[in-house]
Amino acid sequence: MALLTSLYLCSRTVYAAVGTPTGSGARVVAAAQTELPEGCLINGVITNEADLTAALKEFFTANKLPMNRVALIAGGSQFMHRILSLPAMSEKKRMAVLSHELASGGAEVKAPLDDYMLLSRDARTRVDTVLATRVEQRVIAGYDALAKAVGFKLYSIDLGLAAPIKAVRTIPDLQQKTFVLLQFDDDTISACLFVQGQYTYSTRSRLFNPRGSAESGTEIAQKLSGLIQFHTTSKSEHRIETVCFAGSTADDLAVCRPGCEALGLQVDRFPDSPTVRLPSGTALADVLYAAGNLIAR
């Protein structure tokens, strides 16, 4: 298969991973990142197309990134999502049910595009658990226009949340764990809850205190405490044991560790995957969204 350039666009830092899907993971041959000019991309929303276009042109050129097949992974509040349980049915009927459920859940938009990702399948009951997502057509049109302006060929667009879900599937040690994946994305934190290796819930919020400060460590501990309380009220029999950090610095880990341990959580970096091959010196935790996007669903 020809190389794909996976491009993660959400906050000020842009990540790219060049590679191909494999039968059980992905092969990444190059990875790069850059910081965008301030104010051209905020929480996945393009706010200054001219500056963003110029910065991405320079990023692709400086890192010699292939431009003929770009798999975009986008995040932010423009993408709405829900977990749904659906019985066996035709694809046409399934999409109709998804549309109804997303609309009834407050995701009513003028011109929606709906999609879903299979999370698990119960062979006995023939019920599928899916991650359904909705985005307005104008958002996708905006990314298509950006691709044309920068000069790359858009191969696919996927929901940011899909990348860590796919990455977790490739790591045997996480399959029976109940943990929180904490992804640092500039001044934004995404917290994804996995119960026995299955994605269950996520939140995304801004940090009010500077990263690496003692105050940010306290703030993050408060966010985790709220997530633990939410999980407890769901009456799950599985206790949250660990918090895995991705996109974090040594300072982030240092200031967060005391608060996490006070909550009874083990602190780890998100582990590498045995089936995601990365360039020497690159950790999966540092390129999780861009690399995870290369893993086939």
Residue positions per predicted region:
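Hydrophobic/aromatic-enriched cytosolic interaction surfaces used to assemble or bind macromolecules
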Residues: M1-R297
